[in-house]
Amino acid sequence: MIYQPPAGARDVLPLEVAQKRWIEQRLQQTFHRWSYQQIITPTLERLETLMAGGAIQPETVIQFWDAEEGLLGLRPELTASIARAAVTRMAGAIYPQRLYYSANIFRRSPGMELSSQQEFFQTGVELLGGSGLADGEILLLLQDCLHSLGLPEWHVVLGEAGLTRSLLSNFPLELQPHIRQAIARLDRVALTELPSDLRQPALDLLDLRGEPASVLQRLAQLDLKPEQRQIVHHLKTLLELVGDRFPLTLDLSLIQTFDYYTGIVFDVIATGEREQRLLGEGGRYDQLLARYHPGGESLPGIGFALNLEDLHQVLLPTGQLPQQMPTSQWLIVPVHPEAIAAAFSYAEKLRGQPESQELRVEMALEWLSPEATREYARCRQITYIAWIEADGSPQIEAVKG
């Protein structure tokens, strides 16, 4: 039998780990500069927690049955778990709370092949207790994150879940799910099959995307309700704040997979020569925390998640990521069995020096001839060999290439 990971899972080997840690560390440094603090939530949660009151479909969750706990699941995203943690564990916290995470998620897509990837790694933020001004902070933080990675080409697609949902409410209730699904899939053909009096309004909603000024102009021509105009005004203010800091498309047909968003939603997309790649997504969810509170009390929230695998693929061709594993600077070799304890002590001394935080020291674990030891050190690109006598005295040798 050949032992392999189960379908949908994969091993991540040391060089790829180092490359992804490079990405994570730069993102975390950016989060720290913006005063975000790390939170860790369980990989395994109760299924009702993960479903977020019906906003997340159960078929996307890898599920387990436990005799005592009932239905459990592996988290398909982090926002619901963090919302639950904020309500149940942070009752006395002072808001706003700025939180970030770096974690794996597990997600099934309906109709996906069994061999399709089901484990992913995400790094993201949640800003809890922030009003509309938090929208601007999150978009500017997103920009800072991507700049910290030296990402070559990217743009943001910005939507407004509350406004899109409100515009959909003009259609007959029984047709709203069909129209919503068609718009989410950009399925113009499905919309042309609607009754004649609904066809053009649905197509108009689908076409509310493009250059922001143009979309806002088209919105101004619609007969909007006061609350809809208020949302449009907020969008204008947000777009003025962002300005031309990064390329942005306004798209009111943007509908996210998870249905807990109530305000702005956005995708960040890499726009390379070969293909477009979704790097992350986010949005505002002002009612989510109420679903976990016994009294239904809520706090506004907004956040985003960046997909580590996709960032990794986009950054690989740039040459920024580590191209090889760090090598040891020292190889410590006891010259005979009586020198083993002294060799370990010498290695410990090297590692304990104040300036040795990044120093890599390894012990020779096999009894090799001096020439075989030197060849090993050359192959591993080790800088120095320390030959240790029983009394602890070292003979230092620089490894010649």
Curated annotation (Swiss-Prot):
What compartments host this protein? Answer: Cytoplasm
Q: Output the GO biological process annotations, alphabetical, semicolon-separated.
A: histidyl-tRNA aminoacylation; L-histidine biosynthetic process
Q: In which pathway does it act?
A: Amino-acid biosynthesis; L-histidine biosynthesis; L-histidine from 5-phospho-alpha-D-ribose 1-diphosphate: step 1/9
Task: Tell me where on the tree of life, at the top rank, the source sits.
Answer: Bacteria
**Annotated keywords:** Amino-acid biosynthesis, Cytoplasm, Histidine biosynthesis
Q: Which GO terms describe its molecular function?
A: histidine-tRNA ligase activity
Query: CDD domains in the record, alphabetically?
Result: HisRS-like_core
Q: Which InterPro entries match?
A: aa-tRNA-synth_II, aa-tRNA-synth_II/BPL/LPL, HisRS-like_core, HisRS/HisZ, HisZ
- Entry GO terms, CC: cytoplasm
| NCBIfam families to which the protein is assigned, alphabetical | hisZ_biosyn_reg (TIGR00443), PRK12292.2-3 (NF008940)
Quaternary organization? Heteromultimer composed of HisG and HisZ subunits.
As a miscellaneous remark, the entry gives: This function is generally fulfilled by the C-terminal part of HisG, which is missing in some bacteria such as this one.
Query: What does this protein do, in the record's words?
Result: Required for the first step of histidine biosynthesis. May allow the feedback regulation of ATP phosphoribosyltransferase activity by histidine.
Q: What is this protein called?
A: ATP phosphoribosyltransferase regulatory subunit
